[in-house]
């Protein structure tokens, strides 16, 4: 029974080396080692540097996680890992390490799509979330509106045609020298600022549910380049206005999709879902329309391995398994 089985999960798709251990509904360990300090001086994630850091840290983090859970490696029943999308080098480090663990203890090895992990993240702390529901997945590399009719039945209604929302935050933050990652930096600088101080565009696309953020980024940089030196605009007002434009754009299409499909359950995930303004407006929309809303905590919105464990567990329950549930040693000759 899955209630008693211990699932070990790995997440190394970008710049977090994350390992989690799940037993039934109980999250025993959720370790996240961030590389923000490493990449900050570059103004963004450098793929080769990220993969090297994963390789250097993953072994120690694995043993520390086992010790924290008071477990032996032989206690693990299932091993799971992210298999993409993400940075290839980073993914390879986690995939190979996880697969070697599964092989060494002769246990099933399951792969999980990174975005399905974000989609399942609310389940970590709230097992009442059930389909059908509409989810808004917003990360550094992806912006998606997904209708979940049943577990394993995911209908992509909208996506970005250029930059993702996370990229829009990061690129402008780099341009302004606000810091990295861009989303948290802009949110912090914008605290107390007037979100309506600057009129920035809310880009539209030909497809009603798709997104485009490159034009917003360009409009914001052009605004700054043409700013009168005597203008008394504050950093807080500018950051708050830019953040508001991104949040409004995200919610505009999402609200339309929810209203047109008539779903009564909504959720969200991805690193940008940690943004306090986006969460606030999502909750207001749910309250005003009598919708059930399921959001992971800000910490569980960003990349973590707990979501990989839960997604793997959910895939097993619903029989939506990415690869055959086999013991690797039985197929290695």
Named regions from a protein language model:
Residues 118-120, 296-333:
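Glycine-rich phosphate-binding/hydrolytic loop that grips phosphoryl groups
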Residues 188-266, 275-285, 289, 315-319:
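A contiguous, well-structured pocket-lining segment that forms one wall/lid of small-molecule binding clefts
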Residues 2-85, 118:
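N-terminal beta-alpha supersecondary unit
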Residues 1-5, 112-134, 311:
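Conserved phosphate-binding catalytic cores of ATP/NTP-utilizing and phosphoryl-transfer enzymes
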Residues 16-22, 135-137, 143-147:
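Short beta-strand scaffold segments in enzyme catalytic cores
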Residues 127, 150-192, 217-226:
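Glycine-rich phosphate-binding loop plus the immediately following alpha-helix
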Residues 72-83, 261-273, 294:
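Short glycine-rich phosphate-binding loop at a beta-alpha junction
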Residues 111-112, 266, 283-307, 322:
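Conserved phosphate-binding/catalytic loops in two-lobed NTP-binding clefts
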């Amino acid at each position: 029974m899955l209630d008693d089985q211990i699932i070990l999960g790995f997440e190394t798709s970008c710049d977090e080396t994350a390992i989690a251990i799940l037993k039934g509904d109980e999250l025993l360990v959720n370790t996240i080692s961030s590389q923000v300090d490493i990449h900050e001086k570059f103004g963004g994630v450098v793929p080769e540097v990220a993969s090297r850091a994963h390789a250097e840290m993953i072994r120690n983090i694995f043993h520390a996680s086992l010790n924290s859970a008071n477990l032996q490696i032989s206690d693990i029943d299932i091993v799971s890992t992210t298999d993409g999308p993400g940075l290839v080098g980073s993914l390879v480090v986690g995939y190979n390490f996880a697969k070697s663990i599964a092989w060494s203890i002769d246990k099933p090895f399951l792969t999980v799509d990174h975005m399905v992990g974000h989609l399942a993240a609310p389940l970590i702390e709230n097992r009442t979330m059930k389909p059908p529901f509409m989810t808004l997945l917003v990360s550094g590399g992806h912006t998606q509106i997904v209708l979940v009719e049943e577990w394993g039945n995911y209908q992509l209604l909208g996506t970005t045609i250029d930059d993702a929302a996370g990229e829009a935050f990061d690129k402008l933050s780099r341009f302004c020298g606000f810091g990295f990652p861009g989303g948290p930096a802009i949110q912090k600088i914008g605290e107390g600022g007037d979100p309506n101080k600057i009129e920035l565009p809310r880009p539209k696309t030909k497809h009603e549910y798709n997104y485009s953020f490159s034009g917003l980024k360009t409009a914001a940089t052009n605004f700054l380049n043409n700013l009168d030196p005597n203008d008394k605009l504050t950093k807080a007002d500018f950051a708050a206005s830019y953040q508001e434009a991104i949040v409004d754009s995200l919610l505009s299409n999402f609200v339309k999709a929810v209203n047109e499909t008539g779903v009564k359950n909504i959720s969200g995930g991805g690193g940008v879902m940690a943004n306090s303004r986006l969460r606030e407006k999502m909750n207001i929309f749910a309250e005003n329309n009598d919708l059930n809303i399921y959001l992971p905590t800000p910490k569980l919105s960003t990349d973590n391995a707990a979501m990989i464990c839960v997604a793997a567990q959910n895939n097993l329950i619903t029989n939506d398994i990415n690869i055959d549930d086999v013991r690797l040693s039985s197929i290695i000759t």
